[in-house]
Amino acid sequence: MGEIRSFVLITVALILGKESWVLGDENCLQEQVRLRAQVRQLETRVKQQQVVIAQLLHEKEVQFLDRGQEDSFIDLGGKRHYADCSEIYNDGFKHSGFYKIKPLQSLAEFSVYCDMSDGGGWTVIQRRSDGSENFNRGWNDYENGFGNFVQSNGEYWLGNKNINLLTMQGDYTLKIDLTDFEKNSRFAQYEKFKVGDEKSFYELNIGEYSGTAGDSLSGTFHPEVQWWASHQTMKFSTRDRDNDNYNGNCAEEEQSGWWFNRCHSANLNGVYYQGPYRAETDNGVVWYTWRGWWYSLKSVVMKIRPSDFIPNIV
């Protein structure tokens, strides 16, 4: 009888112990679920904070560049020379701004705005934004470059010499970002963009087109006008250096320097008008295949990067 009682007590103890183990396991699982939920909440908060910090850093960078001071250049410490903005991007510098670059055949560094958005690594060769710069200039100015190399939205022309030095390094893609006064945006992109040297009068060469703005540079939008509207293989002209195919002087009539033919279907260095315009002359900031000859665009950015560049799509 005593043995039976002992067996029963042992059995009851085992059953109670097993139940406590089960309860312990359930409590442990509940605690794990609770902790995991807390971790997810913390991760979400961290991501939200990271977004806020990134936005604040971007706003600070823009304010810094917009102050109009010469110290708005981003100093990389002079550790190495960069051939273009794509090399700067690949070296870990991801903020848009003014940097110093030195193409392979260049004798000296020069300043340029690097657009690290839109996949990164873009070297900006021209910008129109507000009409603050006069683009009706002579050969020397267009050859050497001019404009605002301080403010992030400043207007400038990088200079035909510098554009030649950049594009002779290899195959480059040209992307042109266009915006009208109704806040619509389009782009035109050309492969194998190249500008010749001074002996060729900085001749323009472009390859295959893609984009949403239409192909105004090659003149292929209508075969009947291509002979006079195409900018392909055109020499650069200014008011004091007439290299176009026109009997008159396109640069003088259009009040800008450009790769004129007889005269143009695109002129992104044209007269800046404070709003769209209709006039008998087509001397505005023109991209014919989007807004026609008599609409002057609000903003333009011409930027290039190596064709084999692998963009950041994050």
Curated annotation (Swiss-Prot):
Cell location: Secreted
Cysteine pairs bridged by disulfides in the record: 85-114, 250-263
Domain Fibrinogen C-terminal positions: 76-308
InterPro entries per the UniProt record, alphabetical: FIB_ANG-like (IPR037579), Fibrinogen-like_C (IPR036056), Fibrinogen_a/b/g_C_1 (IPR014716), Fibrinogen_a/b/g_C_dom (IPR002181), Fibrinogen_CS (IPR020837)
Main location: secreted
GO BP term, pick one: negative regulation of T cell activation
One MF annotation (Gene Ontology) recorded for this entry: identical protein binding
Entry annotated with the keyword Transferase: no
Stretches of the chain forming a coiled coil according to its record: 28-62
Signal peptide boundaries: 1-22
Source superkingdom: Eukaryota
Keywords: Adaptive immunity, Coiled coil, Disulfide bond, Immunity, Secreted, Signal
GO cellular component: collagen-containing extracellular matrix; extracellular region; extracellular space
Subunit details: Homodimer. Interacts (via the Fibrinogen C-terminal domain) with LAG3 (via Ig-like domains 1 and 2).
NCBIfam families (alphabetical): GGGWT_bact
Protein role: Immune suppressive molecule that inhibits antigen-specific T-cell activation by acting as a major ligand of LAG3. Responsible for LAG3 T-cell inhibitory function. Binds LAG3 independently from MHC class II (MHC-II). Secreted by, and promotes growth of, hepatocytes.
Protein name according to UniProt: Fibrinogen-like protein 1
Organism this protein belongs to: Rattus norvegicus (Rat)
